[in-house]
Amino acid sequence: KANSGELRLDAERIGISGQSSGGHLAMLSAMRPFDSRYSSIPLDADMPDVDACVRCVGMSWPVINPLSRYRYALQERKNEAEWVGDIPECHDLYWVTDKNMIDGNPVCALENGETVQRPPAIWIQGRPDPVHDYLDPESELGIKEPERFAQRYREAGGDIEVLYIKQTERDSRASFDPLAAFFRKYLG
């Protein structure tokens, strides 16, 4: 937004998008645009005074709940699931503690009643996808994470669509076209 003039953009028509961990970060930053932890690098004095609010969020198979995904990966490693790879070690390296995974967690923010921004959102989810579309056994809802987040987001007053596509079509128009239509709808 601060460079919108130079980039010839309308600062009021900014959306954000990401895949997997990037989808998690997109939603987290969209929900907490005024959180000082996410704006600790000051803008140059000659830059316009802007906020980090976005008009909409597009997510593709996000790691929306880092803690449940971490625990799920540890459990599935015991079952020798090939997809697990080094996911737990990467979580340990990035997050360090469970407390951090809770703090940086859009699902926990909603379930804990945190006051957050709720821009319109879309979640594109491939199926079958054991890495992102799974059931957290600790959830009271008994539904997989995409639907859990969507339900909590709606309960908080947000508008979100969850669109399921074939896992084999994630890198195709089946994924890209709905995102493009979503951004056209909200950004004009």
Role assignments for model-derived ranges:
Residues 5-8, 46-51, 108-117, 187:
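Surface-exposed acidic, glycine-flexible loop patches that form ligand/cofactor-binding
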Residues 14, 97-99, 121, 160-161:
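Hydrophobic anchor at the start of a short beta-strand
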Residues 1-15, 119, 139-145, 152-153:
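Serine-hydrolase-like catalytic core of hydrolytic proteins
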Residues 33, 39-40, 68-113:
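Mobile cap/lid helix-loop segments that gate and shape the active-site cleft of serine hydrolases
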Residues 122-137, 143-188:
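C-terminal catalytic histidine-bearing segment of alpha/beta-hydrolase fold enzymes
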Residues 21-25, 50, 106, 145, ...:
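Stable alpha-helical elements in mature extracytoplasmic
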Residues 50-55, 114-122, 156-159:
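Short, proline-enriched alpha-helix->beta-strand connector loops that line the catalytic pocket
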